[in-house]
UniProtKB/Swiss-Prot annotation:
Belongs to the LipB family. GO terms for biological process: protein modification process. Its EC number is 2.3.1.181. It comes from Cereibacter sphaeroides (strain ATCC 17025 / ATH 2.4.3) (Rhodobacter sphaeroides). The gene is lipB. It comes from the Bacteria. CDD domains: LipB (cd16444). Substrate binds at R71, G72, G73, Q74, Y75, T76, Y77, H78, A151, I152, G153, G164, L165, S166. This is Octanoyltransferase. It is found in: Cytoplasm.
């Protein structure tokens, strides 16, 4: 395990306060005043807009607060029952390759899901992690349905990463209906509990910790 500092934040973390704290931590990491960090938390129900968000993808603008996140990507939902991992790593030291970093985040999610015998997969042109749903009716094209279980969106400031990923453990999946998640209309969303797995947040956190160093060796 590297010297990354891990924190599990209790309760529901207010979005703007958390973003400000994250930006301060990124500056401290860049200045050499603080170690790299991973924060595990939950937010109250809200939508965030990434730098590629399209107005038409905010279907219900009055349903929950909407925050401009400044990260890459489009609209996503955060709320109770979803584990958010904010990942603040020094890519100046680990390698200045944004694409590789995003792939490493996907690898981390895939390895974490495998701890629960869930096969997470990448899809070209669709950042995030997906699961095939043979238990559901095929899509309009006759192909097996695929649902998104994890979203990824990052930003770099002087080669220190922030924002990160979210994994759906047991959120209210109907809350995603207020947006077009990540701008993708033809696929749905799922969660570990929706897949029939009695996983707790503590189980998920332990799996994230166990698998982290495989994707982010020191």
């Amino acid at each position: 395990m590297s010297d990354v500092e891990w924190s599990v934040l209790p309760g529901l973390s207010p979005y703007q306060e958390t973003l400000s704290a994250m930006e301060a931590r990124v500056a401290a990491i860049r200045a050499g005043d603080a170690p790299e960090a991973v924060w595990l938390l939950e937010h109250p129900p809200l939508y965030t807009a990434g730098t590629s968000a399209r107005p038409e993808d905010l279907v219900e603008p009055d349903r929950f607060p909407v925050h401009v996140a400044g990260r890459g990507g489009q609209y996503t939902y955060h709320g109770p029952g979803q584990r958010v991992a904010y990942v603040m790593l020094d890519l100046d030291r680990r390698g200045r390759d944004v694409r590789r970093f995003v792939c490493a985040l996907e690898d981390w999610v895939i390895a974490t899901l495998a701890e629960f015998n869930v096969k997470g997969e990448r899809r070209a042109g669709r950042v995030g992690v997906w699961v095939v749903r043979p238990d559901r009716a095929p899509g309009p094209d006759g192909q097996p349905r695929e649902d998104k279980i994890a979203a990824i969106g990052v930003k770099l400031r002087r080669w220190v990463s922030f924002h990160g990923l979210s994994i759906n453990l047991e959120p209210d999946l109907s809350h995603f209906e207020g947006i077009v998640p990540c701008g993708i209309r033809e696929h749905g969303v799922t969660s570990l509990v929706d897949l029939g797995l009695p996983v707790t947040m503590q189980d998920l956190d332990a799996a994230l910790l166990r698998t982290f160093s495989r994707s982010f060796p020191d």
